[in-house]
């Protein structure tokens, strides 16, 4: 699937969010430096994915990467903890967005592996300072820690394998920054 078609597919999924999820909380705007104005952290993880797509379409690749991984972290905690109240509709929606948006953003993000790793650190910092009110962090502490640890491990994996990843990208005709 071509990148623009993936973005359009993600847009269609988000457009029908109301059908799968119901009302999505949030909508206020906060400024997260250097990633710009975004929905407040109390928004459903799908809104963070949608914002990532908008940032990518606007040419703000680092911001798109940040909001994709912020959405992914929130989605995994939300879906992984029974006390969060996630529904089957949430699981289907977030899975579709992860696949569609991730397949569009990751090739862009990993053109700069060191930059992507730095952005993941920023996501982890943001997550600690901007809790989502729809997640019961006391009841979900083990899940939250496990998901955060997974992102830390993934970050380290890409740094440890950066040379191989760059070489593979070159072999596949993808640019490195």
Question: Which functions belong to the PLM regions below?
Answer:
Residues 22-40, 84-177:
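Long, low-complexity, acidic Ser/Pro- and Gly-enriched intrinsically disordered regions
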């Amino acid at each position: 699937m071509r990148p623009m078609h993936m973005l359009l597919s993600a847009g269609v999924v988000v457009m029908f969010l109301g059908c799968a999820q119901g009302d999505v909380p949030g909508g206020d705007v906060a400024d997260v430096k250097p990633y710009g104005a975004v929905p407040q952290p109390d928004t459903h993880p799908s809104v963070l994915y949608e914002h990532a797509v908008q940032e990518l379409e606007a040419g703000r690749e680092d911001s798109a990467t940040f909001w994709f991984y912020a959405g992914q972290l929130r989605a995994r905690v939300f879906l992984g903890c029974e006390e969060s109240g996630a529904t089957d509709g949430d699981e289907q929606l977030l899975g579709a967005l992860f696949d569609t948006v991730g397949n569009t953003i990751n090739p862009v993000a990993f053109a700069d592996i060191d930059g992507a790793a730095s952005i993941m650190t920023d996501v982890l910092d943001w997550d600690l300072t901007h809790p989502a009110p729809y997640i019961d962090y006391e009841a979900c502490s083990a899940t939250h820690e496990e998901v955060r640890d997974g992102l830390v491990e993934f970050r380290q994996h890409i740094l440890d394998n950066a040379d191989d990843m760059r070489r593979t990208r070159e072999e596949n005709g993808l640019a490195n920054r």
